[in-house]
Amino acid sequence: DVCDSLVGGRCIHNGCYCERDAPNGNCCNTDGCTARWWCPGTKWD
């Protein structure tokens, strides 16, 4: 899944968090996203 750069790091529909420095696909805390860098928070926040 690809993060939306407008989300600003909040949880989006697929439970993915966007890395602020790379908003177009570096996500964490969800099995459905590729995590190259980890960011704070949980998929339920």
Swiss-Prot record:
One GO CC term on file: extracellular region
Main location: secreted
Presence of keyword Calcium: no
UniProtKB keywords: Bromination, Disulfide bond, Hydroxylation, Ion channel impairing toxin, Neurotoxin, Secreted, Toxin
Tissue expression as described in the entry: Expressed by the venom duct.
Modification 4-hydroxyproline, positions: P23, P40
Single GO molecular function: toxin activity
Disulfide cysteine pairs (residue numbers): C3-C16, C11-C28, C18-C33, C27-C39
In-chain residues carrying the UniProt-annotated modification 6'-bromotryptophan: W37, W38, W44
Subcellular location field: Secreted
Function as written in the Swiss-Prot or TrEMBL entry: Mu-conotoxins block voltage-gated sodium channels. This toxin reversibly blocks voltage-gated sodium channel in cephalopods, with no alteration in the voltage dependence of sodium conductance or on the kinetics of inactivation.
Free-text comment about domains: The cysteine framework is XII (C-C-C-C-CC-C-C).
The name this protein goes by in its record: Mu-conotoxin-like Cal 12.1.2c
